[in-house]
């Protein structure tokens, strides 16, 4: 194990406390994002604005789902949030539209792990991808959440391999490194200035 016995015991106490909190809150709410609230409270002390991380308020998430919803319940669809944060927008959708496959994406590993935990305890079925959603080839990590929940009733998490990610999205492995290198080269290239700004000639 990576941690010592005393540390593992502390983590188990945290897990038990989180489960008890969720059981209490979900008696009066449809969903509850404890991790997102804690993360924003800690981030507001200093680094939140610098990192550009602002999670959508809970009531706004509910309002967005209600505004885009219809009387007809959708099932068997893939619903995606390319900047999931702690996954609260997908949670708001899930409680009103059960039976869909949720896909959460974020560049932050911390956000992805919060989403994994939230999807697990709320009974969501789907996957969480850590990458820049504008660069889908740049896969960093991924998790399948509750892949066997509908057949066994057991909540589980399974790591996603890079091959599984690319196969599901039809992203070929050949030429990937070359394209990423070309992108990085263009990104690091100096910006050329127009001739009118670089010329040293003066008008007499």
Regions found by a protein language model. Give the residues of each.
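Proteins with a high burden of low-complexity, intrinsically disordered sequence enriched in S/T/G/P/A and R
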Residues: 1-12, 28, 107, 116, ...
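Class I S-adenosyl-L-methionine
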Residues: 1-97
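Aromatic-enriched hydrophobic runs in primary sequence
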Residues: 32-41, 49, 53, 87, ...
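Conserved S-adenosyl-L-methionine
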Residues: 57-145
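S-adenosylmethionine
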Residues: 118-121, 125, 129-204
